[in-house]
Curated annotation (Swiss-Prot):
<keyword id="KW-0812">Transmembrane</keyword>
<feature type="transmembrane region" description="Helical">
    <location>
        <begin position="288"/>
        <end position="308"/>
    </location>
</feature>
<feature type="transmembrane region" description="Helical">
    <location>
        <begin position="178"/>
        <end position="198"/>
    </location>
</feature>
<feature type="transmembrane region" description="Helical">
    <location>
        <begin position="226"/>
        <end position="246"/>
    </location>
</feature>
<keyword id="KW-0813">Transport</keyword>
<comment type="function">
    <text>Component of the ubiquinol-cytochrome c reductase complex (complex III or cytochrome b-c1 complex) that is part of the mitochondrial respiratory chain. The b-c1 complex mediates electron transfer from ubiquinol to cytochrome c. Contributes to the generation of a proton gradient across the mitochondrial membrane that is then used for ATP synthesis.</text>
</comment>
<dbReference type="InterPro" id="IPR005798">
    <property type="entry name" value="Cyt_b/b6_C"/>
</dbReference>
<dbReference type="GO" id="GO:0005743">
    <property type="term" value="C:mitochondrial inner membrane"/>
</dbReference>
<keyword id="KW-0249">Electron transport</keyword>
<protein>
    <recommendedName>
        <fullName>Cytochrome b</fullName>
    </recommendedName>
</protein>
<keyword id="KW-0479">Metal-binding</keyword>
<dbReference type="InterPro" id="IPR016174">
    <property type="entry name" value="Di-haem_cyt_TM"/>
</dbReference>
<dbReference type="GO" id="GO:0046872">
    <property type="term" value="F:metal ion binding"/>
</dbReference>
<feature type="binding site" description="axial binding residue">
    <location>
        <position position="196"/>
    </location>
    <ligand>
        <name>heme b b566</name>
    </ligand>
</feature>
<dbReference type="InterPro" id="IPR048260">
    <property type="entry name" value="Cytochrome_b_C_euk/bac"/>
</dbReference>
<feature type="binding site">
    <location>
        <position position="201"/>
    </location>
    <ligand>
        <name>a ubiquinone</name>
    </ligand>
</feature>
<keyword id="KW-0999">Mitochondrion inner membrane</keyword>
C-alpha cells in the first residue's frame, strides 16, 4: 500500500498534497478554513447539480420551478436550503480565511495570495449570479442595479450593459446566460483552487509566529487530517442548524415575491456577504467613483504585500498594528450593517465615515504602525 501511495503517478500527487505533506507543527485552528472552503465547494457543486436537474432558466417558469423543487421533489427543500445557506457558510469561511491571511502576513506568499484574490472575485461573481436565478423581486432588481453599474464605464458602458443583458433590460436572455455561467464557474473555481494549492505547496504554509518553520515540520496526516475533521464536524453542525431551523434567516423576504419589472422594492440590497462592498459603493455620490471604490474594496488586498513595512511577518508580536487590524474588522461589521439600511440620515454619513476609515486603515495607518513598531523594537 505504501508502495502504491508513493509510486503511482496519480496517487503520488494526492500523497504529496494531503498525506506526507510537511506542515508546520504549530498551525492553529485558523488554518482549518482552507479545507472547510474545499468542503463548502464540494457541497455547493453537489447540491447545485441536483437543483439544476429540476430548475428551468426561463423567466416564465424559473420562480415556479424553485417552488416545485421545495414542494414536490424528494428532499428538494433540503437541497435548496443547503445550497442557499451553504453559500453563506462559504462566505463566512472565506472572510475568516482572508482575515487570517491578513493577520498572519500570509500575503507575503504573493502567488498564492493573488490566486486567492482571483478566487474571491470568482466566488463573488458565482454567488451574485446564483442569487438572480430564483427570479424573485430581489433577484431581478439586484441583477438590474448591479449590472447597470457597468454603464458608468466611459464610452463603452451602455453597449457593455446591453451586451450582458442580451437586450434592453434584464430579461429571459439574461436569466439563461446567468444560469449557464453559474453552472460553469464552480468548475473553473475548482481548477483555480488546485493552482492555489500548487502555489501554496511551493512555499509551504505560514504559521502563527510568522517565522520560518523548516526546522520543525510534521506530516499532514494524521495530525492535521484529524484536526481538519473537527472543523468539518463543526461546519456541518452549524450548516444543518441553519438549514433545518432557520432556513430563511439570512435571506430576503422580497425574494418570495415573483419578479415584477413594474414594481420596485422599497429597498434594494444584495445578500449579507456583499453588504460591506455595497455600503462602500453607495457612500460615493458619483456613479463611476462608486464602482471604482467597490472594485478597490476587494482589489486593495493585492496591495497588501507592497504596504507591508514591518520587519516581522505576522501581527502576533505587533500590538499597535493588531489594534488597527481589529478596528478594521469592527469597521467591516459597521459597513455590513450600513449596507442593509435605507439611504437616509444618519446612515449615509456613517457609511461614508466607515468607507473612508476602511481605506485609511489599510493604506495609511497599518503601514505607519509597522514602521513605528520597527523603531520601538530596534528592528531597523
Amino acid at each position: 500500500m505504501t508502495n502504491i501511495r508513493k509510486k503511482h503517478p496519480l496517487i503520488k500527487i494526492i500523497n504529496h498534497s494531503f498525506i506526507d505533506l510537511p506542515a508546520p507543527s504549530n498551525i492553529s485552528s485558523w488554518w482549518n478554513f482552507g479545507s472547510l472552503l474545499g468542503l463548502c465547494l464540494i457541497i455547493q457543486i453537489l447540491t447545485g447539480l441536483f437543483l439544476a436537474m429540476h430548475y428551468t432558466s426561463d423567466t416564465a417558469t424559473a420562480f415556479s420551478s424553485v417552488a416545485h423543487i421545495c414542494r414536490d421533489v424528494n428532499y428538494g427543500w433540503l437541497i435548496r436550503y443547503m445550497h442557499a445557506n451553504g453559500a453563506s457558510m462559504f462566505f463566512i469561511c472565506l472572510f475568516l480565511h482572508v482575515g487570517r491571511g491578513v493577520y498572519y502576513g500570509s500575503y507575503n506568499m504573493i502567488e498564492t495570495w493573488n490566486m486567492g484574490i482571483i478566487l474571491l472575485f470568482a466566488v463573488m461573481a458565482t454567488a451574485f449570479m446564483g442569487y438572480v436565478l430564483p427570479w424573485g423581486q430581489m433577484s431581478f432588481w439586484g441583477a438590474t442595479v448591479i449590472t447597470n453599474l457597468l454603464s458608468a464605464i466611459p464610452y463603452i458602458g451602455t453597449t457593455l450593459v446591453e451586451w450582458i443583458w442580451g437586450g434592453f433590460s434584464v430579461d429571459k436572455a439574461t436569466l439563461t446566460r446567468f444560469f449557464a455561467f453559474h453552472f460553469i464557474l464552480p468548475f473553473i473555481i475548482t481548477a483555480l483552487v488546485l493552482v492555489h494549492l500548487l502555489f501554496l505547496h511551493e512555499t509551504g504554509s505560514n504559521n502563527p509566529t510568522g517565522l520560518n518553520s523548516d526546522a520543525d515540520k510534521i506530516p499532514f496526516h494524521p495530525y492535521y487530517t484529524i484536526k481538519d475533521f473537527l472543523g468539518v464536524l463543526i461546519l456541518l453542525m452549524v450548516s444543518m442548524i441553519l438549514t433545518l431551523f432557520f432556513p430563511d434567516v439570512l435571506g430576503d423576504p422580497d425574494n418570495y415575491t415573483p419578479a415584477n419589472p413594474l414594481n420596485t422594492p422599497p429597498h434594494i440590497k444584495p445578500e449579507w456577504y456583499f453588504l460591506f462592498a455595497y455600503a462602500i459603493l453607495r457612500s460615493i455620490p458619483n456613479k463611476l467613483g462608486g464602482v471604482l471604490a467597490l472594485i478597490l474594496s476587494i482589489l486593495i488586498l493585492a496591495l497588501m504585500p507592497l504596504l507591508h513595512t514591518s520587519k516581522q511577518r505576522a501581527l502576533t508580536f505587533r500590538p499597535i498594528t493588531q489594534t488597527m487590524y481589529w478596528i478594521l474588522v469592527a469597521d467591516l461589521f459597521i459597513l455590513t450593517w450600513i449596507g442593509g439600511q435605507p439611504v437616509e440620515y444618519p446612515f449615509i454619513i456613517i457609511g461614508q465615515a466607515a468607507s473612508i476609515a476602511y481605506f485609511t486603515i489599510i493604506v495609511i495607518l497599518m503601514p505607519i504602525a509597522g514602521m513605528i513598531e520597527n523603531n520601538i523594537m530596534d528592528l531597523d
